[in-house]
Curated annotation (Swiss-Prot):
Name of this protein: Large ribosomal subunit protein bL25
UniProt keyword Nucleotidyltransferase present: no
Species of the source: Moorella thermoacetica (strain ATCC 39073 / JCM 9320)
InterPro entries in the cross-refs: Rbsml_bL25/Gln-tRNA_synth_N (IPR020056), Ribosomal_bL25/Gln-tRNA_synth (IPR011035), Ribosomal_bL25_b-dom (IPR020057), Ribosomal_bL25_C (IPR037121), Ribosomal_bL25_long (IPR001021), Ribosomal_L25_dom (IPR029751), Ribosomal_uL5_bac-type (IPR020930)
Family membership: Belongs to the bacterial ribosomal protein bL25 family. CTC subfamily.
Amino acid sequence: MQAQTLEVTMRPEVGKQAARRLRRQGKLPGIIYGKKIANLAVIIPARQLEHILATEGENALLKLVVSGDGQNKEFTAVIREVQRHPLKGNLTHVDFYQVSMEDKLRATVPVILEGEARGVKEGGILQHGVREIEIESLPADLPESIVVDVSHLGVGEHLTVGEIKVPAGVKILSEPDTVIATVVTTRAVETETEEETTTGESPAQPAE
């Protein structure tokens, strides 16, 4: 994975009021931290970061160029946490974690199902199990997502984490027996729906 350059500046003011002013200017408050550096408050260009998230995903490897106090610093980092407005969905705060290219790190990556399952062609329904798995790799080997081919799955068959093939240098940490995808019959889905409906119904109250 190639590092994406993001230019940020030192943030002299912290607190809610200062953060609101930044957002009105199209900027975001953020922080850089890691094992070998002190916490560093920064100002992030919102539009540029949104573009990186849209094209590279939240597991993007970043080269942060920090300016301020008459000097420039560079950090290799990953996005550790993204905060968004609960209603509007826009970014409100971002945490960056400094990494070493020689040290492995853990990350949660999305699982994307690819292909039309054989069982679906036979009248079954494909059900998605877990949508994310935990992995470990060097920063340069960190994938944006794990793509899994499900075209071979027939009715009644499933695919587990232990059967996934990952790129070289990537180790899966999630439990191997965790189900990624299953092809079930239409009747099985109908039965499950009926059971959920029955469970959700309240018993009739006797008339007074």
